[in-house]
Amino acid sequence: MLLAAVWICGVALHAQTPQPWVIGPFTRPAEGNPVITPRPESTFMDPILKKPVQWEALHTFNPAAIVRHGKIYVLYRAEDNTGVMEIGGHTSRLGLAESKDGIHFKRMGEPVFYPADDDQNAREWPGGVEDPRIVESADGMYVLTYTQWNRETYSVGIATSRDLMHWTKYGPAFLNADGGKYAQLKYKHPNDKDPSLGTPYKSAGIVTELVKGRLIAAKMNGMYWMYWGEGAIHLATSTDLIHWNPVEYANGVAVELLRPRPGHFDSSFPETGPPPVRTPAGIIVIYNGKNAVGSGDPDLGPEAYAAGEALFDAKNPANFLVQTAEPVLKPELPYEKTGQYAAGTTFAEGLVYFHKQWFLYYGCADSLVAVATAPGK
């Protein structure tokens, strides 16, 4: 989709007081956090290795969330104890947990989504399936966006389910977009300027809206919309929630809606958070920002991840309006700054509306899952 079909404008508002459109303020519950932690006793017969693995032994983090049958369900990334002791050096699978109150969870003993001997094996092994986001369609289908990682390339994968237990994988979201150029991207750090590697192709949230108290994938101008990206935040469209096309400038480069801001919490780069929410005020995009070393927010540790919010036009998802100058959630507590990413993270990926409150689920230091809540508006 070319930029000619949409338009981009707007100026960031650097306000120090809460803005009326913002979801928040977020507070952490007095008890219960972190809500999901590693369990070395959990084992799973891996279909590729053909042997039992301790699939959630080391880290459980970066959660998606959805409301189903009056409960909150969380799909969380779990890392086993294989591979090497470095970030991304283990195999990731997705576990499932359910809660009646959003804080106390009952967990499945085995992962519900994982690399297997299927047509996505080459994209998902040995790195695994990472960093999920989930939405529900109007007809009750669950659509999962996740990172496929084979330790050489990554992409946003798409999968669907009717029960959160049994999944159909469709492969990369942009597999056939623009001649397949997005399917060939090599891994690169978001700050790497080598153009041969391409645009970082991960982290995707499909736009939703509240319909009778449920967050449902929203259709605008006859299409579904998805904000995606790490390094900058981009936009894509779809007619079926499965096959997606990035919105591009006339020169074929993916449009950039949010970019790094020197002196702010997202000074190194912004990255898409949970599925955005369309409201009368506009589309609220909760996103994660990485603080730059030396040129970032002086009140936030170097390389820390914190969550902020941006607002886009409710009728034109490419029209940027405003974003928060300060994070709405940042690493402050020990469990948010202790783990395999000691610089600290409050990495938001799951957002639900439940019992007239917002529940925001986030990864802590790439190691744990926690929750913060905000009043419903």
Model-inferred region functions:
Residues 2-11:
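Bacterial N-terminal signal peptides
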Residues 16-127, 135-268, 277-341, 355-377:
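Beta-rich carbohydrate-recognition and catalytic domains
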Residues 271:
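ATP/pyrophosphate-binding catalytic subdomain of soluble kinases
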Residues 341-344, 348:
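C-terminal structured domain segments
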